[in-house]
């Protein structure tokens, strides 16, 4: 296990690591909602509150969503869907995983020394500078990010090599499964954006420790430069988080609809490519309040709205794939339908925020929090749940209890919506982000939001119980539920240690 070069074992390690980190991240979010449940202070001052918020973001993004979607599902499914015997660089694959536990350890250490890194996950100077955050906390967080970044870059190189070099000779680009496409595009985005983040946080590190002035106006630097560099990474990053989810949802909807391919398969591929490309030219929409020229704001507003077009193509293609089919309303199907609906809601609030003039008012309010939690907590997480339930029988050879899964879906659906829908109202009413206290006019919606978070917590506990029950009762799977449109279901269930002794013949 520790030194395994098998893509299945490494994928399983990623799943276990992601689940553990997810529990840490969820605990942090419960602390946030407990603090905000009533006006007045519960935990302490805003420094400790901001440390919790910062750690919650980092843990959920870098140690939960990315390891599960890219590391877990990517490692497990890409070689199986390509008919490849393993990844292109199996030992580097192992190293990619083992960079993550030290990275997480450094991040958790940053919260425990001095007074913690209370900067928000963006690490903006001058708040993250040596003066405002003296001590080792921010430095530890920066090293943690470096390690996570190296891990992701190595993984990205590995996936790109695998997808280009290890597919069957007659698998033309439009025949490559959509999930493999999505992971390939994700890997490309990682490869192009992470070095910029590494440069930005390295400059921040030297500003803090080696007396440089990249972001210090007193020495001729500019803190806005940091924001440009960070968001040039930060915006592609949010597409990195959702693209593998897009690929998985495409497969699940095809599978559940009994169709042989998605509606507009080529259009789906080009939509993902367009999203990946456009993701790099919209970064300053995170900075509408820093005083950019009006023509710059106009460009970033327009470019951001253009991203809604390929995203809309994907959503309507999913709907068209389901059209006319007899849906079974199985658990993966429910998660996929929930994904399509809630991701659309999150996308619509994104179009609202894309308007630079409106964003001046809504920037740094709970409206933004509601927007990105709809696309992450109900986009990425719903995709993870859908994919996990869909492929769990393939990975383990065991079956989950379908009735309990539907009940668990209902509880989770209620919980996340109750948590994040009221935050739109809080944002429109002007409640700012990253404060541990608020005027009592905001109490009602915050109470509802906190109740929703507790319901979600119960739903997650129930899911852990469903998995435990499945493994302890050991119900073997006899055959897949439906004839499938992708080749991973032709494996034994669970697959053999080495799936392909020779390259399979793919005939269409």
UniProtKB/Swiss-Prot annotation:
Transmembrane listed as a keyword: yes
Enzymatic reactions: 4 Fe(II)-[cytochrome c] + O2 + 8 H(+)(in) = 4 Fe(III)-[cytochrome c] + 2 H2O + 4 H(+)(out)
EC number: 7.1.1.9
Entry comment describing in which tissues the protein is expressed: Expressed in all tissues examined. Highest levels in gut and fat body, lower levels in ovary and collateral glands.
Transmembrane annotation, as ranges: 7-35, 46-81, 90-112, 136-165, 178-207, 223-256, 265-281, 294-322, 331-352, 366-395, 402-428, 442-473
Cross-link (1'-histidyl-3'-tyrosine (His-Tyr)): 235-239
Subcellular location: Mitochondrion inner membrane
UniProt entry keywords in alphabetical sequence: Calcium, Copper, Electron transport, Heme, Iron, Magnesium, Membrane, Metal-binding, Mitochondrion, Mitochondrion inner membrane, Respiratory chain, Translocase, Transmembrane, Transmembrane helix, Transport
Cellular-component GO terms for this entry: mitochondrial inner membrane; respiratory chain complex IV
Cofactor: heme; Cu cation
Residues given in the record as Ca(2+) binding sites: 35, 40
Mitochondrial matrix side: 1-6, 82-89, 166-177, 257-264, 323-330, 396-401, 474-508
Binding positions (heme a3): 371
GO terms of molecular function: cytochrome-c oxidase activity; heme binding; metal ion binding
Pathway connected to this protein: Energy metabolism; oxidative phosphorylation
Mitochondrial intermembrane side: 36-45, 113-135, 208-222, 282-293, 353-365, 429-441
Family matches, as Gene3D superfamilies: Cytochrome c oxidase-like, subunit I domain
Membrane topology: Multi-pass membrane protein
Pfam family, one: COX1
Oligomer status and interactors: Component of the cytochrome c oxidase (complex IV, CIV), a multisubunit enzyme composed of a catalytic core of 3 subunits and several supernumerary subunits. The complex exists as a monomer or a dimer and forms supercomplexes (SCs) in the inner mitochondrial membrane with ubiquinol-cytochrome c oxidoreductase (cytochrome b-c1 complex, complex III, CIII).
Family: Belongs to the heme-copper respiratory oxidase family.
Function recorded in the entry: Component of the cytochrome c oxidase, the last enzyme in the mitochondrial electron transport chain which drives oxidative phosphorylation. The respiratory chain contains 3 multisubunit complexes succinate dehydrogenase (complex II, CII), ubiquinol-cytochrome c oxidoreductase (cytochrome b-c1 complex, complex III, CIII) and cytochrome c oxidase (complex IV, CIV), that cooperate to transfer electrons derived from NADH and succinate to molecular oxygen, creating an electrochemical gradient over the inner membrane that drives transmembrane transport and the ATP synthase.
Name of protein: Cytochrome c oxidase subunit 1
Source organism (scientific name): Blattella germanica
């Amino acid at each position: 296990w520790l030194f395994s070069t098998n893509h299945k074992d490494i994928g399983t390690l990623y799943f276990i690591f992601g689940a553990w980190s997810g529990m840490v991240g969820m605990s942090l979010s419960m602390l946030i909602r407990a603090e905000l449940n009533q006006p007045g202070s519960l935990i302490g001052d805003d420094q400790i509150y901001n440390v919790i918020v910062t750690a919650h973001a980092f843990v959920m993004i870098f140690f939960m969503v990315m390891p599960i979607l890219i590391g877990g599902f990517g490692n497990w499914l890409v070689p199986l869907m390509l008919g490849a015997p393993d990844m292109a660089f199996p030992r580097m694959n192992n190293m990619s995983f083992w960079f993550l536990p030290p990275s997480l350890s450094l991040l958790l250490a940053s919260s425990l020394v001095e007074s913690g890194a209370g900067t928000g996950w963006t690490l903006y100077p001058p708040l993250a500078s040596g003066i405002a955050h003296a001590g080792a906390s921010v430095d530890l967080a920066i090293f943690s990010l470096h390690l996570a970044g190296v891990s992701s870059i190595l993984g990205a190189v590995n996936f790109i090599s695998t997808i280009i070099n290890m597919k069957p000779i007659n698998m033309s680009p439009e025949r490559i499964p959509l999930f493999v496409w999505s992971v390939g595009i994700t890997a490309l985005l990682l490869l192009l954006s992470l070095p910029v983040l590494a440069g930005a946080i390295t400059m921040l590190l030297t500003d803090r420790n080696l007396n440089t002035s990249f972001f210090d106006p007193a020495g001729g630097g500019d803190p806005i430069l940091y924001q440009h560099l960070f968001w040039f990474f930060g915006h592609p990053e949010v597409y990195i988080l959702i693209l593998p989810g897009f690929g998985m949802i495409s497969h699940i909807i095809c599978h559940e609809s009994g169709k042989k391919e998605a509606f507009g398969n080529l259009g789906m591929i080009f939509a993902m490519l367009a999203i990946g490309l456009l993701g790099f030219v919209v970064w300053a929409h995170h900075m509408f309040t820093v005083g950019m020229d009006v023509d710059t704001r106009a460009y970033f507003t327009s470019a951001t709205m253009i991203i809604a077009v390929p995203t809309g193509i994907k959503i309507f293609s999913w709907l068209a794939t389901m059209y006319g089919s007899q849906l079974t309303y199985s658990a993966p199907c429910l998660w996929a339908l929930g994904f399509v609906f809630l991701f659309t809601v999150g996308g619509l609030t994104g179009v609202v925020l894309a308007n630079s003039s409106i964003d001046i008012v809504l920037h740094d309010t709970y409206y933004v929090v509601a927007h990105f939690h709809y696309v992450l907590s109900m986009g990425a997480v719903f995709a993870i749940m859908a994919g996990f339930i869909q492929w769990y029988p393939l990975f383990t050879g065991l079956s989950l209890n379908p009735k309990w899964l539907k009940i668990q879906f209902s509880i989770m659906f209620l919980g996340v919506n109750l948590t994040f829908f009221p935050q739109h109202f809080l944002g429109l009413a002007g409640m700012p982000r990253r404060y541990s206290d608020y005027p009592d006019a905001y109490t009602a919606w915050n109470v509802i939001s906190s109740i929703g978070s507790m319901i979600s917590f119960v739903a997650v506990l129930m899911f852990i119980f469903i998995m435990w029950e499945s493994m302890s009762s050991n119900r073997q799977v006899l055959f897949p539920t439906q004839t499938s449109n992708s080749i991973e279901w032709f494996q034994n269930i669970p697959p053999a240690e080495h799936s392909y002794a020779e390259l399979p013949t793919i005939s269409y």
